[in-house]
Amino acid sequence: SRDGYELVDIANQFYNKLLNDKDYDLADKWTIYVFPEVNQDGLANGWTNNGPGRTTLYSQAPNNKGIDMNRCWQIGDSYTRFTSNRNYNGTAGFQAYEAQALRDFMLANKSQNGQTLLVDLHGWTQQLIGNEEICSYYDRQFPENNKKSVGRYGTGYMIAWGRTYLGSTNRAAKTALIELPNQGVTGHQSVVNGNFANRYINATLDMLKNMN
């Protein structure tokens, strides 16, 4: 779960950058929601990246087993089940309370007649996944990342669900998952040395300024 703190720190740096820059043009163009910490129990009390910590600690699944929050986003009536400790996703979609809350918030706050963008930040498999246009901005900052999954949206992934359900009356939602690099990453200092936070922030701001 310590890995999660690095992602929370990057999200908080992005949030503070938005506050400090006071970019009113950007504020007029977008309503920006930042979720630094969606698996709070896993972050605080988890103990492994292949089970509790990566997954939630409690859910509506049988025996209240924790859920991989990026495998439980059901689309329509079909649901692909994952049973490993690393990717366990219950017996039906949204058995993680945290995923339910995030889903409901996004549905309530998606654009009604404009463009919704969804960027899901993860570590550390060094990939760009999802919408080609969004991924192009992160490719400029993370050229070492694998691009084989650009244009793909995974099974049970939040970005697949978002692409399906967060569109407006006029425009389809655009979604992507950014997996931070793993090369040379051994702890917090290597994340700092790799300038991951600034690279992520610069890519995100560039995307927001140039996409419509």
Question: Predicted regions: what is each one?
Answer:
Residues 1-140, 144:
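Active-site/substrate-binding loop(s) of hydrolase catalytic cores
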Residues 19, 142-151, 210-212:
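Structural alpha-beta junctions
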Residues 29, 146-157:
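A generic structural motif
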Residues 62, 68, 95-96, 153-165:
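Secondary-structure junction/capping motif
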Residues 99, 150, 203:
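Cysteine-dependent hydrolase recognition
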Residues 118, 127-132, 136-140, 154-212:
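Active-site-adjacent mobile loop/cap segments within catalytic or ligand-binding domains
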